[in-house]
Amino acid sequence: MKAYQREFIEFALEKQVLKFGEFTLKSGRKSPYFFNAGLFNTGRDLARLGRFYAAALADSGIEFDVLFGPAYKGIPIATTTAVALADHHDIDTPYCFNRKEAKDHGEGGNLVGSALEGRIMLVDDVITAGTAIRESMEIIQANGADLAGVLVAIDRQEKGKGELSAIQEVERDFACAVISIVSLSDLITFLEEKGDTAEHLDAVKAYRAQYGI
C-alpha cells in the first residue's frame, strides 16, 4: 500500500466517510464497513479529495484526454481532480460533465465543460451496480469518444449477483481498466497495521471470505 492510499483511509475515517460497524446495503447484505463519499462536503475536504484522485491517476499511468464526471456525484469529483492535476502534477486536463436533463436554451445540450472527445477517464465515487457507468458509456459513444478507464474512490472487491464484482463486469463489458484509490485489500492491510482494531479486522475478513472475489 502506498503512502497516499494510507493517508486516504485516514482521511476517510477522520471525516466519517468510512465507518466500521454493521450496515445493511441496498443489496440486503450486512456489511462491516460503509463508505459515504457525500460526507466530503467542505471546500477543504474537496481539495484534499481531488489530490487523492489525481495521485491515483498519476500512479495508474493510463493515458487520457478528458476527465468526465457523471451527474451528480461525479461532477465535483471531476472538477477537483482537474484542479489537483494542474496544481500538483502540472497536467492541464480538460473536464466535462453531463446534465441529467438536456437544456434547450443557451448553449443547449446535456454536456457542460470541454468537448467529450478522444480518450475519456470517467471519475466517480463508487461502482455498485455499474448502472451509472453504462449510462455514461452511451453519452461517451454518442460523442464518438472512447473510454480509457474508470477511477473510483474504493473498490469493495465483492461479488455482484454472479461470480464477478460490478467492477469486473464493467471491465469485461467495456474493455477498460477500472482503478481505485483504495480497495478492500488495502482496508484490511490498514487494519492489520493498526493493531488495535481486531474486532473490525475479523469482521471485514469474514465478509471478504463470504462475498469477496
Curated annotation (Swiss-Prot):
<feature type="binding site">
    <location>
        <position position="105"/>
    </location>
    <ligand>
        <name>5-phospho-alpha-D-ribose 1-diphosphate</name>
    </ligand>
</feature>
<comment type="subunit">
    <text>Homodimer.</text>
</comment>
<dbReference type="InterPro" id="IPR029057">
    <property type="entry name" value="PRTase-like"/>
</dbReference>
<dbReference type="Pfam" id="PF00156">
    <property type="entry name" value="Pribosyltran"/>
</dbReference>
<dbReference type="InterPro" id="IPR000836">
    <property type="entry name" value="PRibTrfase_dom"/>
</dbReference>
<dbReference type="GO" id="GO:0006207">
    <property type="term" value="P:'de novo' pyrimidine nucleobase biosynthetic process"/>
</dbReference>
<feature type="binding site">
    <location>
        <position position="103"/>
    </location>
    <ligand>
        <name>5-phospho-alpha-D-ribose 1-diphosphate</name>
    </ligand>
</feature>
<dbReference type="InterPro" id="IPR004467">
    <property type="entry name" value="Or_phspho_trans_dom"/>
</dbReference>
<keyword id="KW-0460">Magnesium</keyword>
<feature type="binding site" description="in other chain">
    <location>
        <position position="100"/>
    </location>
    <ligand>
        <name>5-phospho-alpha-D-ribose 1-diphosphate</name>
    </ligand>
</feature>
<feature type="binding site">
    <location>
        <begin position="34"/>
        <end position="35"/>
    </location>
    <ligand>
        <name>orotate</name>
    </ligand>
</feature>
<feature type="binding site">
    <location>
        <position position="128"/>
    </location>
    <ligand>
        <name>orotate</name>
    </ligand>
</feature>
<dbReference type="GO" id="GO:0005737">
    <property type="term" value="C:cytoplasm"/>
</dbReference>
<protein>
    <recommendedName>
        <fullName>Orotate phosphoribosyltransferase</fullName>
        <ecNumber>2.4.2.10</ecNumber>
    </recommendedName>
</protein>
<feature type="binding site">
    <location>
        <position position="156"/>
    </location>
    <ligand>
        <name>orotate</name>
    </ligand>
</feature>
<dbReference type="GO" id="GO:0044205">
    <property type="term" value="P:'de novo' UMP biosynthetic process"/>
</dbReference>
<feature type="binding site" description="in other chain">
    <location>
        <position position="26"/>
    </location>
    <ligand>
        <name>5-phospho-alpha-D-ribose 1-diphosphate</name>
    </ligand>
</feature>
<comment type="similarity">
    <text>Belongs to the purine/pyrimidine phosphoribosyltransferase family. PyrE subfamily.</text>
</comment>
<comment type="function">
    <text>Catalyzes the transfer of a ribosyl phosphate group from 5-phosphoribose 1-diphosphate to orotate, leading to the formation of orotidine monophosphate (OMP).</text>
</comment>
<feature type="binding site" description="in other chain">
    <location>
        <begin position="72"/>
        <end position="73"/>
    </location>
    <ligand>
        <name>5-phospho-alpha-D-ribose 1-diphosphate</name>
    </ligand>
</feature>
<dbReference type="GO" id="GO:0000287">
    <property type="term" value="F:magnesium ion binding"/>
</dbReference>
<keyword id="KW-0808">Transferase</keyword>
<dbReference type="GO" id="GO:0004588">
    <property type="term" value="F:orotate phosphoribosyltransferase activity"/>
</dbReference>
<comment type="pathway">
    <text>Pyrimidine metabolism; UMP biosynthesis via de novo pathway; UMP from orotate: step 1/2.</text>
</comment>
<keyword id="KW-0665">Pyrimidine biosynthesis</keyword>
<feature type="binding site" description="in other chain">
    <location>
        <begin position="124"/>
        <end position="132"/>
    </location>
    <ligand>
        <name>5-phospho-alpha-D-ribose 1-diphosphate</name>
    </ligand>
</feature>
<keyword id="KW-0328">Glycosyltransferase</keyword>
<feature type="binding site">
    <location>
        <position position="99"/>
    </location>
    <ligand>
        <name>5-phospho-alpha-D-ribose 1-diphosphate</name>
    </ligand>
</feature>
<dbReference type="GO" id="GO:0046132">
    <property type="term" value="P:pyrimidine ribonucleoside biosynthetic process"/>
</dbReference>
<dbReference type="InterPro" id="IPR023031">
    <property type="entry name" value="OPRT"/>
</dbReference>
